[in-house]
Structure formats: structure tokens, C-alpha cells
Amino acid sequence: MDIIWSNGCYDILHRGHLELLKYARSLGDKLVVGIDSDKKVRKSKGEGRPVNNQDDRKFFLESLIYVDEVVIFNTPKELEGRVESIRPKFIVIGCLLYTSPSPRD
């Protein structure tokens, strides 16, 4: 099974997000989306953010047909651990596409 990973804050979900997720899902069999915790979004984007809390953002993404699983992370170490555990074939972030650095079993 080819797993695809995408992550971001996904606050104020818009057409660009949806197009990205649709494209990401087309690359494999399962799309896992990581979202920044409220604390992480506030730290990077400032007070008043996120507009939608992490539970709502998770719910919105889980409601999309392109998304198979959503996880919330708070630190770069948590993000790294999650990506290492699922070993995605591709990582899609914004307009960037990364391939796995080594063959998967």
C-alpha cells in the first residue's frame, strides 16, 4: 500500500488546500494528513490564530473524501516520529513533493 503524507496547519481551509489534498491522494492508496496543534499554530502565526481549533480542523479534514487519516502534532520531533513510523512513499507539502529517501519493504 502506497501511503502519502501531507502536513500543515490547515486553518481556514480553502480551495488551494483542497486541490493539494486531491493531488496528494491521487499519488497513492492512503493519504495521512498531519495538522499543527493549536499551540504550534499560535507560536508560528501569532495571537488570534488559529481561527479554527485543532479539533475542528481535524474534523473538517476527516470529512474530505481524499483524506484517510488525520493526526495532530505539537513538535517537530512528534512530526518526525509519525512520518518515520508510517514510511510514506511521498510527502506533499504546498507545491513540494518529496520521495522516500530509501526503498520500503
Residue ranges and their predicted role:
Residues 58, 79-80:
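Short hydrophobic/charged patches on amphipathic alpha-helices used for structural packing
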Residues 98-105:
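Conserved small/polar residues in nucleotide/adenosyl-binding loops
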Residues 1-35:
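N-terminal catalytic cores of NTP/NDP-binding nucleotidyl/phosphoryl-transfer enzymes
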Residues 35, 74, 94-96:
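Short secondary-structure boundary segments
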Residues 83, 87-93:
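Proline-aspartate-enriched helix->loop->beta-strand connector
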Residues 39-45:
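A short acidic, helix-capping loop that chelates divalent metal ions and anchors anionic groups
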Residues 58-73:
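Short acidic amphipathic segments
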Residues 45-51:
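Short glycine-enriched, charge-decorated loop/helix-capping segments at active-site entrances
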